[in-house]
């Protein structure tokens, strides 16, 4: 049986499963779910084997909110001996396909993490054997070298069990298990800074940073205190207006790049139409935040927005779907072209991060 394996944050398997099942049904592909609760793994077992690769070709991973990474299985669970595991894996895999990279992966729980050292040690002889068999290309260390290639995934359930599969380099995360490993900057006043750092890395292509994430831009941070998100803007050389009734970190104020206005983020409106970035991590009802973000963009108060929508305890997938639809409806009402993506990022917890921008002129922009 062919399955699609999806990685997500532990505790969000139901949301991840509901989403892939819904998106597959939209493409007339069906199957049933197997959820590995609190392991961050979802198995979507397809009724038709050909639908695994077909769905991966049709559905962009970036359109899935809760899935960090995914792959299509090419083997069932393989039992590994205590000796010569490499030979067992290469025999099960065969040599019909060629892959541009290898990902050694495991569940995102304590049992899975205990396998990380084992996987690192095994990856070296496994790569060598796969190259020798011409299953892994000689480069075989970076999927960016072959964006049209396939990635080989080895999901270790234990030291004695593995599932093999593939993803498409152009439609999968470049990170093992979809997890970027970011270092917390000691100069930041809050760990929330990693959320925005990851968001920029995830949503904005690196070859567009010089145009969209560059020094000299004006930015607004709603709900800014103590300055975790402001820090990411400042370190990129932007001039920031920080809006929050709380105090900002003195280290940020001393840069000369931050103006702090003590007021409600829902009431602030910029006097000039020269703001490029709006960022927002307010602990507020997601419906209110979604409405506010669409208003800022439609009125031309900013060019791009990066914001978090807090998730409820129950009905999380439905709630975030409704909030995104609110934004889409507002844009559609004014007949504008737009870009809107949401992702439950690694450094997010009970929230999802959303990126939005208009691709046509802001219809409600005031004439200067």
Swiss-Prot record:
One Pfam family this sequence matches: RLMM_N
Keywords: Cytoplasm, Methyltransferase, rRNA processing, S-adenosyl-L-methionine, Transferase
UniProt: S-adenosyl-L-methionine binding residues: 192, 225-228, 244, 264, 281
InterPro entries given in the database record: RlmM_FDX (IPR040739), RlmM_THUMP-like (IPR048646), RNA_MeTrfase_FtsJ_dom (IPR002877), rRNA_MeTrfase_M (IPR011224), SAM-dependent_MTases_sf (IPR029063)
Location of the active site: 310 (proton acceptor)
Catalytic activity entry: cytidine(2498) in 23S rRNA + S-adenosyl-L-methionine = 2'-O-methylcytidine(2498) in 23S rRNA + S-adenosyl-L-homocysteine + H(+)
Main subcellular location: cytoplasm
Gene Ontology molecular function: any one: S-adenosylmethionine-dependent methyltransferase activity
GO biological processes: methylation; rRNA processing
Its EC number(s): 2.1.1.186
GO cellular component, one term: cytoplasm
Gene3D superfamilies attached to this UniProt entry: 3.30.2300.20, 3.30.70.2810, Vaccinia Virus protein VP39 (3.40.50.150)
Subcellular location: Cytoplasm
HAMAP family (UniProt xref): 23SrRNA_methyltr_M (MF_01551)
Family listed: Belongs to the class I-like SAM-binding methyltransferase superfamily. RNA methyltransferase RlmE family. RlmM subfamily.
Subunit details: Monomer.
NCBIfam families with a match to the protein in the record: PRK11760.1
Main function: Catalyzes the 2'-O-methylation at nucleotide C2498 in 23S rRNA.
Name of this chain's protein: Ribosomal RNA large subunit methyltransferase M
Organism, scientific name: Colwellia psychrerythraea (strain 34H / ATCC BAA-681) (Vibrio psychroerythus)
Lineage: Bacteria, Pseudomonadati, Pseudomonadota, Gammaproteobacteria, Alteromonadales
């Amino acid at each position: 049986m062919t399955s699609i394996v999806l990685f997500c944050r532990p505790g969000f398997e139901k949301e991840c499963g509901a989403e892939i099942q819904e998106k597959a049904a939209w493409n007339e592909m069906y199957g049933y779910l197997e959820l590995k609760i609190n392991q961050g793994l979802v198995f979507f077992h397809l009724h038709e084997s050909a639908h695994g690769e077909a769905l991966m070709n049709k559905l962009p991973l970036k359109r899935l909110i809760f899935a960090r990474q995914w792959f299509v299985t090419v083997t069932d669970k393989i039992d590994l001996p205590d000796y010569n595991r490499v030979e067992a894996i290469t025999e099960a895999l065969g040599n019909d396909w060629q892959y541009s990279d290898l990902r050694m992966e495991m569940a995102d729980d304590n049992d899975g993490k205990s396998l990380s050292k084992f996987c690192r040690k095994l990856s070296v002889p496994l790569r060598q054997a796969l190259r020798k068999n011409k299953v892994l290309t000689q480069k075989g260390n970076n999927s960016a070298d072959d964006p049209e290639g396939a990635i080989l995934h080895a999901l270790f359930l234990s030291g004695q069990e593995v599932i093999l599969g593939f993803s498409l380099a152009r439609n999968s995360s470049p990170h093992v298990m979809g997890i970027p490993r970011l270092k917390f900057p000691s100069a930041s006043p809050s760990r929330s800074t990693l959320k925005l750092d990851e968001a920029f890395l995830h949503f904005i292509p690196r070859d567009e940073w010089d145009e969209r994430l560059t020094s000299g831009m004006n930015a607004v941070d709603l709900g800014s205190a103590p300055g975790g998100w402001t820090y990411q803007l400042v370190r990129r050389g932007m001039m920031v207006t920080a809006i929050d009734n709380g105090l900002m970190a003195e280290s940020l104020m001393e840069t000369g790049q931050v103006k702090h206005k003590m007021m409600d983020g829902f009431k602030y409106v910029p006097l000039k139409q020269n703001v490029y970035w709006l960022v927002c991590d307010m602990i507020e009802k997601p419906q209110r935040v979604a409405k506010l973000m669409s208003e800022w963009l439609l009125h031309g108060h900013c060019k791009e927005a990066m914001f978090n929508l807090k998730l409820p305890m129950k009905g999380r997938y439905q709630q975030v779907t409704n909030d995104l639809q609110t934004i889409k409806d507002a844009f559609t009402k004014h007949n504008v072209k737009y870009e809107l993506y949401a992702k439950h990022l690694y450094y997010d917890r009970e929230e999802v991060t959303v990126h939005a921008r208009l691709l046509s002129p802001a219809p409600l922009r005031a004439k200067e």
